[in-house]
């Protein structure tokens, strides 16, 4: 269980947001309200997707690092950077995929960044990009939700995240108008079970504390909530007397939300998953003496310097993860309606040892 400072305050704020009905409307994160921009068409989205796939495939087949980073941003850029480190170390590769025919969810929006979602079946070709760290195994072939963004009228379209749905999980129907555009949901909307911008903190409370968390009243159990909690508990093995902690926390990356057909929200967001094994004196701010050797999991080795001495004080790891979650409408007749986290992407990005 995690007990890092700030977790209780974050949970209190998130639970207060659940069921809130008096919050004024606001625009999605990063959107400039009131400006007029042309809508993204299906043809344009198709061109952006095809261009990305062609460049990514060429980069993966040649190992060209500059090309691999040329059309990505946000979570995806950090993920690719880590894959390149894994490839250089020989423990992974720049992941190469084959894609099926995409379907596009085009939001009705004003201002920048402009964005859209490509939903497509993706199959891994060859080695995975880098060793996993969540303990969750996703199939080599599965449906992914790809978020593409354009930061300004003159900026290129870039892929900002790719989140895969576990087998058996589906995306809910969205609220499209007669032209096929989907309504967005303000991140502080009170029309859902929880404000969309509270989805991440509520998920984090369950990942940090498990089924006993108060947030479990509004967040459904599953692979990407209680499953991450269960995996985190055994991800590292602390020596006798040392402490092991983990925390799912927010990031500076923009969140987006689309309205579902039933009035809920499909929310896209990113979180850091931090974990650490350390001698108690570090947490307690006491006199620090070296402890017994800390076991370094094999999947972290490529992120540490070669010849790194066995850590005896602290071992840190960080993952940057993208998620998609379904936030049901407020006042849903079923008392069992909860936030469902349906997709995950990203992975390990950092480790240190002392």
List each language-model region with its residue ranges.
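N-terminal export and membrane-targeting signals
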Residues: 1-10
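C-terminal motif of bacterial Sec signal peptides marking the signal peptidase cleavage site
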Residues: 15-19
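Bacterial signal peptide processing site
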Residues: 21-24
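Long, glycine/tryptophan/cysteine-rich extracytoplasmic
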Residues: 33-36, 97, 302-307
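Core segments of small alpha/beta cavity-forming domains
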Residues: 36-88, 169, 174-244
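Solvent-exposed loop/turn segments at secondary-structure junctions
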Residues: 75-76, 124, 166-167, 273-275, ...
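Surface-exposed, charged secondary-structure patches
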Residues: 87-141, 242-296
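Short beta-strand edge/turn micro-motifs at domain boundaries
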Residues: 129-194, 204, 260-268, 294, ...
């Amino acid at each position: 269980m995690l007990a890092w400072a700030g977790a209780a305050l974050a949970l209190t704020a998130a639970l207060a947001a659940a069921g809130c009905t008096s919050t004024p409307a606001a625009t999605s994160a990063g959107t400039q309200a009131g400006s007029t921009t042309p809508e993204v068409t299906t043809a344009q989205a198709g061109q952006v997707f095809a261009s990305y796939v062609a460049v990514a495939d060429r980069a993966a087949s040649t190992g060209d690092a500059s090309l691999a980073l040329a059309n990505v941003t946000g979570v995806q850029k950090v993920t690719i950077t880590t894959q390149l480190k894994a490839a250089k170390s020989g423990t992974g590769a720049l992941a190469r995929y084959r894609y099926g025919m995409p379907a596009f969810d085009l939001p009705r929006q004003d201002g920048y960044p402009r964005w859209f979602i490509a939903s497509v079946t993706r199959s891994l070709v060859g080695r995975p990009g880098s060793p996993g760290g969540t303990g969750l195994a996703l199939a080599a072939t599965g449906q992914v939700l790809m978020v593409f963004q354009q930061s300004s009228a003159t900026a290129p379209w870039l892929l900002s995240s790719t989140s895969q749905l576990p087998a058996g999980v589906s995306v809910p129907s969205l609220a499209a108008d007669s032209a096929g555009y989907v309504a967005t949901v303000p991140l502080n909307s009170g029309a859902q079970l929880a404000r969309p911008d509270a989805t991440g903190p509520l998920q984090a409370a369950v990942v940090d504390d498990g089924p006993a968390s108060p947030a479990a009243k509004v967040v459904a159990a599953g692979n990407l909530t209680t499953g991450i909690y269960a995996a985190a508990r055994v991800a590292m093995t602390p020596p006798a007397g040392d402490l092991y902690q983990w925390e799912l926390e927010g990031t500076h990356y923009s969140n987006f939300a689309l309205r579902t057909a039933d009035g809920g929200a499909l929310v896209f967001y990113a979180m850091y998953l931090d974990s650490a094994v350390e001698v108690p004196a570090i947490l307690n701010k006491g006199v620090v003496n070296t402890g017994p050797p800390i076991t370094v999991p094999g999947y972290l080795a490529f992120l540490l310097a070669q010849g790194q001495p066995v850590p005896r004080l602290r071992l840190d790891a960080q993952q940057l993860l993208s998620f998609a979650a379904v936030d049901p409408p407020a006042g849903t007749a079923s008392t069992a309606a909860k936030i469902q986290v349906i997709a995950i992407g990203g992975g390990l990005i950092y480790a240190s040892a002392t």
